[in-house]
A protein has these predicted regions:
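Sec-dependent bacterial lipoprotein signal peptides
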Residues: 1-20
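Compositionally biased, intrinsically disordered/low-complexity regions enriched for serine, proline
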Residues: 9, 44-45, 189
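Amphipathic alpha-helical interaction segments
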Residues: 13, 65, 74, 148-151
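Ser/Thr-rich, Pro/Gly/Ala-heavy low-complexity intrinsically disordered linkers and tails
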Residues: 18-45
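Sequence contexts marking disulfide-bonded cysteines in secreted/extracellular proteins
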Residues: 21-23, 67-69, 86-88, 167-170
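Sequence context surrounding c-type heme c attachment/ligation sites in exported
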Residues: 23-28, 32, 51, 56, ...
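N-terminal secretory signal peptides
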Residues: 46-99
Length: 194
């Protein structure tokens, strides 16, 4: 079973049955440094890079104007994210019917919840494609935090913690039926909302 920062702090009993598709023996839960320094504040369609900047950007709620799933739900296998709601920016929404790599700027926010009846997210997972070539996940930025535990993941796809907690699973998005829980899933993105 995959042990990760989400499973440690958000309802691990529900997580047990949902992680078989994305296994990793690395149980790291530490945070990498503030990736990229966080100097870019982002904009309404692009999250910034760096934990402090992403935290402030999420608090602004600007992503709630994106293409969001209508309700909180149990995560789709093989996700380890327990209970969530995904919001995709226009880059993903406008290219969801495609089959090639996502354009630069593709981004999503996954609100993480402790239960399907919770009304406030207990954490967030954010990803952003930073270059045209995904380079096996190296050119994707990932951020993950839990309200109770602070930032757990913050860095590019080759960062050791990011690789064990995010990239190792997201690499399989769209690769086969088990890793395509939503139409259009591919190139690091499992659930393109449009």
């Amino acid at each position: 079973m995959r042990t990760n920062w989400i499973g440690t702090l958000l309802a691990p009993s529900i997580l047990v049955g949902m992680t078989a598709g994305c296994s990793s023996n690395n149980a790291s839960s530490g945070s990498s440094s503030d990736a990229g320094g966080g100097s870019d504040a982002g904009n309404s369609q692009t999250p910034p890079i760096g934990a402090s900047a992403v935290t402030a950007w999420l608090a602004s709620g600007v992503y709630k104007g994106w293409h969001c799933e209508s309700a909180v739900h149990m995560a789709r296998p093989p996700s380890p994210h327990n209970v969530d709601r995904v919001c995709s920016n226009d880059v993903i929404a406008n290219n969801a019917a495609g089959s090639g790599p996502w354009p630069v700027g593709a981004a999503a926010v996954k609100e993480l919840y402790a239960s399907t009846t919770a009304t406030t997210p207990g954490g967030y997972a954010v990803y952003l494609k930073t270059q045209a070539d995904s380079a096996n996940g190296a050119n994707w930025y990932y951020y993950g935090s839990l309200t109770a535990g602070g930032t757990a993941v913050d860095g590019m796809g080759t960062d050791a913690t990011v690789m064990s907690q995010c990239t190792s699973c997201h690499l399989a998005a769209g690769s086969d039926a088990a890793h395509t829980p939503s139409p259009g899933g591919r190139d690091e993105v499992y659930t393109p909302v449009h």
